[in-house]
Amino acid sequence: MLAIGLEGSANKLGVGIMLHPDDGSSPQVLANVRHTYVSPPGEGFLPKDTARHHRAWVVRLVKRTLREARISPDDVDCICFTQGPGMGAPLQSVAVAARMLSLLWKKPLVGVNHCVGHIEMGRLITGSTNPVVLYVSGGNTQVIAYSSQRYRIFGETLDIAVGNCLDRFARTLHISNDPAPGYNIEQLAKKGKQLVELPYTVKGMDCSFSGMLAAIDALAASYGLDGPQSDEAVDANSPAAVEAGENGKPTRADLCFSLQETIFSMLVEITERAMAHVGSKEVLIVGGVGCNERLQEMMGIMARDRGGSVHATDERFCIDNGIMIAQAGLLAYKTGFRTPLKESACTQRFRTDAVFVKWRD
């Protein structure tokens, strides 16, 4: 079976083609292409601008995936698309494209939960069996475990997502958004040496990041580190970003280092608590923030201390992509699931545990 997957819940537009061979052998990624809307330094991406980007690029990406996979529309069994969660306008622009392909190619639609797409792609690539999942991205922060054909949420953010916290601090420092603000924060953090104390807010298996963001924004302002320092965006490799401050004054690199260390410590704590609760020795990290090497390192230390292991994917599959939507969509399609055209509206707050996972025991 072949599926084409369309993802566009945020600023990344992805199209992928997945093959599930009829002989039951391992699924194959035939094509996985992506194009990112990059906003100017110091700014986030607005829904209307992101949707405009997706509309401009989606047909080109679909054509490119068909060429790379060396297939025709006749070979495709279903059209899978992200139905939520995400930003309304970008979601809708990709849903319209999916409906167009469904009508044009006369193929059934399969609406996919974005979070479930991340989980299923992570399970496929890493080979993890029944892990505790840490899902961390620009719009989501959840600790998840599978039970009784649902991906149950054991803990989550009480306000903003971890990726949103990192991205917004990148705006405060006027760090470049290319290739991604979180990535540039990570590169600066590697050069930081001074740990600045920040609010640490964990409540059971839930966490909060808004207070931490407010505190570090205030610190940056008090040390004159907020806003553009020159006519150009801050380069993570520039000496000005990492030079030691006077009288122990923290640098931008120190603030990025402190933010990462505090956030990731919170994530490790709630993940370990979930592991103890469900009795799992595996952790699967998914979502765009899951690419962060320091997060993987800290989680690995915790997991090994418990006699367990950590699984993560590289940027091809960790960052939003179309192939994860094709993978999750095909799993649902093979159980008989279809999304009628009249039920294909997007849901911005599509909960992970709202999906009936019929394809797992």
From Swiss-Prot:
Main location as per UniProt: cytoplasm
EC numbers: 2.3.1.234
Record's catalysed reaction(s): L-threonylcarbamoyladenylate + adenosine(37) in tRNA = N(6)-L-threonylcarbamoyladenosine(37) in tRNA + AMP + H(+)
InterPro entries xrefs: ATPase_NBD, Gcp-like_dom, KAE1/TsaD, Kae1_archaea_euk
UniProt cross-references to PANTHER family, sorted A to Z: TRNA N6-ADENOSINE THREONYLCARBAMOYLTRANSFERASE
Family affiliation: Belongs to the KAE1 / TsaD family.
Name of protein: tRNA N6-adenosine threonylcarbamoyltransferase
Organism per entry: Aspergillus terreus (strain NIH 2624 / FGSC A1156)
Gene: kae1
